Every structure is written in C-alpha cells, then in structure tokens.
A protein has these predicted regions:
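N-terminal leader/signal peptides at the extreme start of proteins
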Residues: 1-11
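Conserved catalytic core of two-component sensor histidine kinases
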Residues: 20, 47, 54
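Aliphatic-rich helix starts adjacent to a transmembrane/signal segment
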Residues: 35-50
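Catalytic phosphate/metal-binding cores of nucleic-acid and nucleotide-processing enzymes, i.e., regions
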Residues: 12, 51, 55
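Alpha-helical hydrophobic helix detector
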Residues: 17-33
Length: 124
C-alpha cells in the first residue's frame, strides 16, 4: 500500500487573525498622523493665500493712491493675484473663503477662522 501524506498548504486562521490585527494596529497609528499632516498643510496653504491677498491689497492701494480708510473689494485686487485663491479647507470661491477687511487690516479666512490667521506685521 502507498502511504499518502496529506500536504495541505496555507495559512491557519490564527495566522490570518494575527496579520489582520497587525494591519489594524498600523492603520490606527498612521491615520491620525495623516489627518494631522493634511490639516497642517491646509492651514499653511491658507495662510500663504492670506499673505498673497494682503500683498495684492497693499499693492493696489499704493498704485492707486487710495486712502487708508478706503474699502477694497475682490474686483479691485483680482488683477494683482496670479490665480484665484480659495481656502483649501473647503472653500469653493474667493467670496466664501476670504474676507477683505480694508487696507490697514489683514484679510481673514471664513472657513476655519480660529487657526487660519495671518499674523500682524511685527516690523515697524
């Protein structure tokens, strides 16, 4: 008689469960870091947009010899911006992303006002 040895190959249920648990643990560590990095990059991009807007406002005011108390609109500064600026944290247009606060005050972000703030000038 021939001896047949059963040579079943594959992973056991325990091995598969261990691999799934390890993948879950790695995901639990990686996902919050990814979300935090994404939020920080959106904040940095928004603050850069605020700098560009402020620079456009100041340039427009200087070139047109506008009084410091004058109001400014997006139509006034659109020619001074290379591209339309939108808050990366969920804005769809300039008007729902940013507020122009005159010439002497910095523009502000409407989307996440608590963290997307352009710091005042410290040079005097």
């Amino acid at each position: 008689m021939k001896n047949r040895t059963s040579s079943k190959q594959g992973f056991t249920l325990v091995e598969i469960m261990i691999v799934v648990a390890i993948i879950g643990l790695l995901a639990a560590i990686a996902i919050p870091n990814f979300v935090r990095a994404r939020t920080q990059s959106q904040k940095n991009a928004c603050i850069n947009n605020l700098r560009q807007i402020d620079s456009a406002v100041q340039t427009w005011a200087l070139e047109n010899k506008v009084a410091a108390s004058a109001t400014v609109s997006f139509g006034n500064i659109s020619g001074y911006l290379k591209d339309a600026v939108v808050c990366p944290a969920g804005g769809t247009a300039f008007s729902d992303s940013y507020t122009l606060n005159g010439i002497t005050n910095k523009p502000t972000c409407q989307k996440v006002s608590s963290s997307h703030i352009l710091a005042p000038d410290t040079t005097t």
